[in-house]
Swiss-Prot record:
One Pfam family this sequence matches: Ribosomal_S20p
Family membership noted in the UniProt record: Belongs to the bacterial ribosomal protein bS20 family.
InterPro entries in the cross-refs: Ribosomal_bS20, Ribosomal_bS20_sf
Record bears the keyword Metal-binding: no
Cellular component annotations (GO), alphabetically ordered: cytosol; small ribosomal subunit
Region described as Disordered: spans on this chain: 1-25
Official protein name in the record: Small ribosomal subunit protein bS20
Amino acid sequence: MANIKSQMKRIRTNEAARKRNQSVKSALRTAIRSFREAAEAGDKDKAAERLQFASRKLDKAASKGVIHPNQAANKKSALALAFNKL
């Protein structure tokens, strides 16, 4: 445990950020999983809706700094490729 006052605050701040980032990443994984399930089922309408939702989640995660913008772009590209194969 830190003895310095500013470091104690950083520990609390980092913990709050970690929980927030964890929540965003979890929601992101859920959105991607729901798209993949719709795509595997062959439901094009539902897959299109979930692709849009997953893309929005990826963009938000990238803008918040939870994931790198290039990672978001790569994942969106892979999801779009999977959608176009339907």
